[in-house]
Amino acid sequence: MGEMIEGAAAGVPFVAVPPVDPGAPAALVAGWHLMDAPAGERAMAEAVPMAGLQAWRVYFGLPLSGARLPEGGYDEVFRRASEDAVLNVFQPVTEQAAGEFPAALAELRDRLPGATGPLGVFGGSAGALVALEVLARGDAEITAAAVASPVVQLAPVIAANERRFGVTYSWTERSRAVAARYDYVDRAAELTAPLLLVAGADDDIAVREPAEALRAKLGTELVTVDGMAHEFPPGTPGAAGVDTAFSEWFARRLRA
């Protein structure tokens, strides 16, 4: 993998890795990490390097993560999530990350040498939710997208967290409206670019079943990674499976 460039674009922290041939025109592939491992922009770059692409790979930091952790750090994020995961974490993270993407993209097009080619977006888990929202909004011309361990429907993920942490989430009219918005099976018609779905064979049904439903509705590709649950930390077989799937997908779909 080429040398990482670290910085901020329109206030959004990122790491970027240059294409195989830095002197030739390149595609731009931009995405967002998980809140689970890999839980940061550098970790995501190490887990899913997509090293063979003639593309700049840009890994954005999510709000409420890394350099943008609130005072109190991850303990404060967990406190907010335990208070209301939908309204305090998923909604603000997704809305901010999707909203800041167009300006960050425009700055990166200017700053990264040769990054004039087609655009791909990607993400994992909560970062996949951002990628799907960016794709649905249509604020940028996206040629292809890929998501791993994707939050395709928010409501089942909240139910999975209830099982995982032994808690009960108190739904309100407002949080139900947010969950309805973050239901990309229902909003499949808004996902107009070719989309690859990647899921771990051992992930929760809250991820696997909505991913399969979206695959069926779009008629798109779903890759299942054997032995992978939800996370795919750098250096694991799961990460290698996601990286292979993403790399092959974008190599087919993006031509600088």
Predicted regions and their residues:
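Short beta-to-alpha linker loops that shape the active-site pocket of alpha/beta-hydrolase fold enzymes
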Residues: G61-S65, V151, M228
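C-terminal catalytic histidine-bearing segment of alpha/beta-hydrolase fold enzymes
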Residues: G219-A256
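Short, surface-exposed alpha-helical segments at coil->helix boundaries
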Residues: F101, R208-E212, A240
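Primarily recognizes the serine-hydrolase "nucleophile elbow" in alpha/beta-hydrolase
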Residues: P102-R164
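Short, flexible, mixed-charge acidic loops at enzyme active sites
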Residues: R68-E83, A160-R164
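The feature captures the conserved acid-bearing segment of alpha/beta-hydrolase catalytic domains
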Residues: A155-K217
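Alpha/beta-hydrolase active-site loop
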Residues: V77-R111
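Short, surface-exposed "cap/lid" segments of acyl-processing enzymes
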Residues: A10-E76
